[in-house]
């Protein structure tokens, strides 16, 4: 089965089945500058959630919107915020923070800020937006806040720090509070932060809650911050055909590497691919595995600096590399085992309150019917084959390495919760990865919710997409629950038809490479990557803020392998290919530069040196090149002797009298002139 698809369309911001064709932005009474910006962004008609929420929010209503990813929730609150800021500026020039947008992750801070900049494109001088999700210190961010922005985008934790330090004042000027991805905000443990923020808000403040699911926690949050809200539910007809094709394939742990290599090598997977793994170690293990086979890729995880993470997402979206390995650690925040059961119970409850104004929208969230159950403990996977791999690493320091490896073995089964990763990192949900053709769950998600969020990174807008999940025996029970949930929601998670015996010829290469990727190799790769990204991060802070075009000079898909990667691994001999592919397969994968030269990232310095030496060696064997004689030149014996004499005189710097008439030189001995003199001289017998 071939996973490839043709997808040349530009990604729309909202799925076509969620567009309200009966409504226009012009009919909402929006500022002309906003309308021009929306047109520039390609917005023709509002989405269903936008057509209902924007008029209500402009009337001052609190909004609780439940809608799936890709339904246009961000524009549903950004448009009325900018409209109200412009209206306030016409009445008064008093500076003050007019709106605060809270998001769960630092990655979303940058994305939401960029969206605000797009909507306010023609009025940027009047509407200032600051995001506090970067890695600047509180003191550095004070400079950004000194001019008092109109809109602040932040994570709850960082906003609390500024409120407690009194660098942000909200009591007298704040008009709107938005909590985007409200269910995820609570999952990340921000409940206490929300309570603190609430104490700094004015008594009268319009609030938005945007969420993909309505859990009990969201209901409690609704009571805390909303007053007589309009509740918008996106109800989707199950019969609607999805653009997403979902597949799963059961395999052993080691076979995941065999499968991913074979699918890429045989061109069964092509295009822009997003790989999800469950922890940082697996992230670098998969990257090192790809590098051994000269496959370019980049990694995205919580240990990288936030500026580098932003830039990696930007470069991936621009198509500078096609393979991105992302660590999804969101399951760590799902500590409450009742969470998914509560979600199911809540979906069946009547959300109508006596004080609530209900507005039903025509589509239903594909996550509405999730009967998700937490399954963290039974689905944790052991790290594979580390014991065998360690024996291959750096034999010269055996004693020292054995001690380190023993420590690694003791700690290898521990969760990585205590890593130095950013607690506000998250990419499986909300992040706009553009034009992703295939999502590969290299490590199967820990929960049903995580599965749904991951596969939502593809098939966005009107585009088609494919989700492929590798399932080991640890995950088979969870796979059954995922399949049931997706089936109940009107989707079909199908088994992937693939004959493993057809790729057995690749097994020895894959397993040989895996033996070289032990714990030490992974640790070294992490150190190398972190050092490089820290360097990139410093550059990003200063120069690249003023020269965004120079971002192309930074590469996040460079190789982490210090040693020369065997060149024979970049090609696969024809005898290893399955019969049906021998006449079609391209013999080469995309090649990683083994050692970039300064000033030219795409050239391999070492390979050039090797080629030069080979050329010199061939030249020495070719008498015509040695004597500087062109090919197809006719020479007499005497002329050849003269040419050889000139060559000897030039190369050996000997006197003409020491050369015989036939062009050969007389027998000579090499003799040192003295013990302290390294010069040699020729003595003629």
From Swiss-Prot:
Comp. bias (Polar residues): 595-606
Residues involved in ATP binding: 67-74
The protein's location, in the record's own words, is:
Nucleus, Nucleolus
Q: Where is this motif: DEAD box?
A: 180-183
Which SMART domains has this protein been placed in? DEXDc, HELICc
- Spell out the residue ranges making up region: Disordered: 332-423, 593-617
User: Bias category Acidic residues: which stretches?
Assistant: 341-358, 365-407
Pinpoint the Helicase C-terminal domain residues: 351-504
| GO BP annotation list | rRNA processing
- Catalyzed reaction equations: ATP + H2O = ADP + phosphate + H(+)
Question: What does the record give as the function of this protein?
Answer: May play a role in later stages of the processing of the pre-ribosomal particles leading to mature 60S ribosomal subunits.
State the family named in the UniProt similarity comment for this chain. Belongs to the DEAD box helicase family. DDX56/DBP9 subfamily.
Question: What's the name of the protein?
Answer: Probable ATP-dependent RNA helicase ddx56
Q: What is the lineage of its organism?
A: Eukaryota, Amoebozoa, Evosea, Eumycetozoa, Dictyostelia
Q: Gene symbol?
A: ddx56
